[in-house]
């Protein structure tokens, strides 16, 4: 009888399926619980299927190019051709991911990263941010000027990917379908067209370091950022399906394009262009990969950003539209800020024109609009919270130059509360 009891005690079972240890290959013990190899395999399949299903849902509901452009139109004024080109490029990128995941075809679609080329304040960063928000994918912005070749003072290129992983809440699968915008990419051009004998750690060296992650590789990313060292653990991330958008002003490239195009228009019967015809925006539309090589990008780098989207400098009309038309227009933002203090804010059309003119004078594009408004209203925004008698502020043309907006007092000496409109919940993703 004692022998039988001992045998019963030794007969261990899986706590999930009930199979005994001699019915399975392996039985793993935990604190008061057992699990067999078959149950482990089943759990692994269920979890991996759920992950694949989640990613597939995100990737199969790709908006059409028209839908992408319509969304961009709500936030980005002008740049019609650029928005079309960008919408098509982004649609094809995520379509390629689905094709390579699902198709048994031998044809594998190759990755196409994007180069946004245009003057400061033309909307390059805004386009990339708006795209990521609409597609509901993780998004990261990196500054190319802070990057250096591995082993030198500065940031390694892998730190770009760390920002993306952090913005995806360390969900690697989600980060692998995100968008990375690398700004100031023109600042890492090598100093001359010919390869340098001396080491260019912040120019050509960075371009070389970026090649692998742009093309698609499994990168090792330090989880805390900083430099790599052999005794730390790394986060592994596959960059094959990450869309890289590089942006830069490329000051001076118009001269390179002009020299190239001028050669083809020499001789008898050639059309003589006036200075007015030599518009920088029109010149940029004629850009060729060879022009980027002459500017200082290496051939391998140019080959990994095959889609070139050019943006034009914003004119006076576009800047005025930017001030008042987009969903998050600056005029709407400042009106909302003043409403929170129960003060009405009014911008006269002449004031918007003066603000646009000042931005053109400073050559800062749309980026300088907020700074000009802040300068105009700095003193008013300082005083308003303390002055209960002020009910309305009017910004006219003179206020832009004198920094003294017109103030209107309340009839009874004290302003009445303004009922704020409840913001409607917008369909679609708000954050990336």
UniProtKB/Swiss-Prot annotation:
Positions that bind Zn(2+): 14, 17, 36, 39
Matching Gene3D superfamilies: 1.10.8.60, ClpX chaperone, C4-type zinc finger domain, P-loop containing nucleotide triphosphate hydrolases
One Pfam family of this chain: AAA_2
Annotated GO CC locations: HslUV protease complex
Xref: PROSITE patterns: CLPX_ZB
Sequence segments annotated as region (Disordered): 411-432
One GO molecular-function entry: zinc ion binding
Comp. bias regions, Basic residues: 416-426
CDD domains (UniProt xref): RecA-like_ClpX
Record has Oxidoreductase as a keyword: no
Binding site for ATP: 119-126
ClpX-type ZB domain segment(s): 2-55
GO biological process: cell division; proteolysis involved in protein catabolic process
Xref: SMART domains: AAA (SM00382), ClpB_D2-small (SM01086), zf-C4_ClpX (SM00994)
InterPro entries: AAA+_ATPase, ATP-dep_Clp_protease_ClpX, ATPase_AAA_core, Clp_ATPase_C, Clp_protease_ATP-bd_su_ClpX, ClpX_bact, P-loop_NTPase, Znf_CppX_C4
The entry's keywords: ATP-binding, Chaperone, Metal-binding, Nucleotide-binding, Zinc
Described function: ATP-dependent specificity component of the Clp protease. It directs the protease to specific substrates. Can perform chaperone functions in the absence of ClpP.
HAMAP family: ClpX
Protein family according to the UniProt entry: Belongs to the ClpX chaperone family.
Subunit structure: Component of the ClpX-ClpP complex. Forms a hexameric ring that, in the presence of ATP, binds to fourteen ClpP subunits assembled into a disk-like structure with a central cavity, resembling the structure of eukaryotic proteasomes.
This protein's name: ATP-dependent Clp protease ATP-binding subunit ClpX
Organism: Clostridium kluyveri (strain NBRC 12016)
